[in-house]
Curated annotation (Swiss-Prot):
Its cofactor is heme b; Ca(2+). It is found in: Secreted. Its EC number is 1.11.1.7. This is Peroxidase 3. Binds 1 heme b (iron(II)-protoporphyrin IX) group per subunit. Binds 2 calcium ions per subunit. Signal peptide: none annotated. Belongs to the peroxidase family. Classical plant (class III) peroxidase subfamily. One of its GO terms (molecular function) is metal ion binding.
Length: 45
């Protein structure tokens, strides 16, 4: 499935496997154990 992040851009990072590009507000297919949504306010500081 897809997780669509658009309202809490400053605190959301979408992480996947080692080949994924990670951007705020991105849409990525999250499948298996390699897909994770992490809420971390300090990530971009």
């Amino acid at each position: 499935g897809f997780e669509v992040i658009d309202n809490i851009k400053d605190s959301v990072v979408i992480l996947g496997g080692p080949n994924w590009n990670v951007k705020m507000g991105d849409i990525r297919p999250l499948t298996g154990s390699n897909g994770e949504i992490r809420f971390d306010n300090n990530y971009f500081k």
